[in-house]
């Protein structure tokens, strides 16, 4: 009896143990299975990170890269041989006189034919088709590379815009906090009768301008980050992402001749223009091959009157009128067009380098002017006027004028730094590489 009760108790306990095992929490340190990847909670993106993300996640670029796979698929099509043809027929069957159906009738009276045909391409058409497709693939790769170059430039440009917006916002917030202290001091002077009500109202109204500057700078930062995220791919960064970096001046010492040489080697659009000439020449060779008449060969087996026979047939169009003259002429003019476009692209590359170099030099000179003393002079003038005003030794108008001059100088200096960094990005785009000589 004890054994029976023990057996019943065990059977009742097993389901509970199984349920407990199924619902048991994971062990400490165990990692649950990942069903998908999600962006981090927060992220600070550097310029190099932004470029890498855009090349990996930008949907427009990904769509364009698919054209390379399409060109590779066209190479497969171009290399295919013609399919053979199969023909079957049965003649003189007594369909309307079924009583005559017999093995003797089928053997002696009916006729059966079976034939196999094949198109023999002349002029090495398949080889020329494949070469033309390969040249088109090479051209497509270069065009995609040029789109990557344009995307990298756009990312760099937008990244600098974000840095400028953040620098402007930081300065506006600092300026607002500093001016609030001036308002507090002015309020105390007005309370003790050391300042007129009109002057105090001017101070308070000026505070509105500082607050408006902060709001405008904050909006510019949000818009710049959104525009940059569009280039990076929205799913590659979290909603509250930020950039890592500051407005910086990095002098570049390079000569124009060396930059032109680098551009001639690295610019993918120039390479694409040269490959377009090669592709046009391949098309001309293909059209000349298409002018060669193909031969169709057929072997036909026939059974009739109890006799099995075979026959060979060959056919070829006579090239009297159509020898593909029009397409050959068109391909020749296409070569001329591609050559002219390649020359135009080479000139455009030189023009881009010259313009970018001049822009970089001009912005470099402007930075030198600001760093040569104008920034410090404006700050020193503002500090002196602020100290004198707080001590009652300067008028309100003099102080406000020095404050406006300082703000304008700081904003212009930040804009000059951003313009220089944009000019540097333009130079990198013009030479086709981020590693300047």
Where are these regions (language model features)?
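N-terminal signal peptide c-region/cleavage motif recognized by signal peptidases
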Residues: 15-16
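Metallo-beta-lactamase
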Residues: 217, 268-269, 338, 416
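Acidic, low-complexity, intrinsically disordered peripheral segments
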Residues: 2-11, 20-23, 37-39, 412-437
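Amphipathic alpha-helical coiled-coil segments
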Residues: 63-78, 147, 151-172, 181-183, ...
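Small/polar, glycine/serine/threonine/aspartate-rich low-complexity segments that form flexible
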Residues: 32-43, 76, 87-122, 129, ...
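Mature N-terminal segment immediately following signal peptide/propeptide cleavage
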Residues: 42-67
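Periplasmic alpha-helical coiled-coil/stalk elements that build and connect Gram-negative outer-membrane
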Residues: 3, 144-262, 359, 363
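Amphipathic alpha-helical coiled-coil scaffold segments and their short linker/junction regions
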Residues: 54-55, 117, 139, 195, ...
